[in-house]
Amino acid sequence: MSDNEIVAGIMRDHIINLLKEGKRIDDRGFEDYRPIEIEVGVIEKAEGSALVKLGSTQVLVGIKTSLGEPFPDTPNMGVMTTNVELVPLASPTFEPGPPDERAIELARVIDRGIRESKALNLEKMVIVPGKIVRVVFIDVHVLDHDGNLMDAIGIAAIAALLNARVPKVRYNEETGEVETLDETEPLPVEKIPVPVTFAKIGNILVVDPSLDEELVMDGKITITTDETGHISAVQKSEGGAFKLEEVMYAVETAFKKAEEIRKLILEAVEKAKQ
C-alpha cells in the first residue's frame, strides 16, 4: 500500500467518524452549502458573464453569441453549446489539452439541465426559420477546484445567461440580409435551473461536497430542478449505489436548496442592473 493510499484511508476514517457524530470536516451541517458568492458582468467583452465562488471553488462563465444555421433536425430552434475548460492552475489533476472525461461530463450535465428545463427558449432565437438563428456559446473556465464543480458551474452558467444582453437584429426581406442594430436585448431566459450535488460517504449523504469529501466518497448524484417543480437533469457518478429512499431524500432536498440558491442568483443579477 502506497503512502497516498494510507493517507486517504486515514482521511476517510476521520471524515466518516465525524459524520457519525453529525459533523462534517469543515463544521457544516449535512445540508449546508459553503458560502456562495455570485458576481455578474465581470467580463467586459462578453455579452454576459458570471464569477461564482463556492467556498474555495471558483468558476468563470462567459456568454458569446453569433448568427448561424440551425441544426437540420431542429430548423425552428436556436443553438446552444456548452464548453468546460479545466484550467491547469486550478488543480494539479488538470492537464492542458482537449477536454477530458470530467470536462465533458460537466458540460453535458449543465447543458442538459438548461436544455431540458427549456430555461433558454431556443424557439425565440430564430431569425429566419430553417436558415438563420442565434447561436449561444456558454464558455466555462474552472479557476480553482476545491470540490463540487457541478453546482458552481451550473450557478454561474444560468447567472451569466440572465446577465447577457445581445445585439438586436432585423431581417431585411428585400435584400435577404440580417441587419445588426445598435440596441441590445436580453436572451429569452424563462426559467432558472439549479443543480444540487450530494456525495455519499458510507451511508450518509451530504450536500455540496468539498474536495476532501469527494476524495473519499462512495458515490455522487446531482439533481437539477427549476422553479416550476420539474427535474431537468439527474447525474450519478463516481460509482456507488443509492437506495430509493436516498434518492427521494436527495430530490426533496434539491428542490429546497435550489430555491435558496435561485434567490442568490436573482439578487446578483438585479444588483448588476443598479
Curated annotation (Swiss-Prot):
Function text: Non-catalytic component of the exosome, which is a complex involved in RNA degradation. Contributes to the structuring of the Rrp41 active site.
Gene Ontology molecular function terms on file: mRNA 3'-UTR AU-rich region binding
GO biological process, one term: rRNA catabolic process
Subunit-level organization: Component of the archaeal exosome complex. Forms a hexameric ring-like arrangement composed of 3 Rrp41-Rrp42 heterodimers. The hexameric ring associates with a trimer of Rrp4 and/or Csl4 subunits.
Pfam families assigned: RNase_PH (PF01138), RNase_PH_C (PF03725)
Localization annotation: Cytoplasm
Keyword entries, A-Z: Cytoplasm, Exosome
Organism per entry: Pyrococcus abyssi (strain GE5 / Orsay)
Gene3D superfamilies registered for this protein in UniProt: GHMP Kinase, N-terminal domain (3.30.230.70)
Claim: Cytoplasm is one of the keywords in the record: yes
Listed HAMAP family: Exosome_Rrp42
Keyword NADP among UniProt keywords: no
GO CC terms in record: cytoplasmic exosome (RNase complex)
InterPro entries listed in its UniProt record: ExoRNase_PH_dom1, ExoRNase_PH_dom2, ExoRNase_PH_dom2_sf, Exosome_comp_Rrp42_subfam, PNPase/RNase_PH_dom_sf, Ribosomal_Su5_D2-typ_SF, Rrp42_archaea
Entries under PANTHER family matching the protein: EXOSOME COMPLEX COMPONENT RRP42, EXOSOME COMPLEX EXONUCLEASE RIBOSOMAL RNA PROCESSING PROTEIN
Record's protein name: Exosome complex component Rrp42
Family membership noted in the UniProt record: Belongs to the RNase PH family. Rrp42 subfamily.
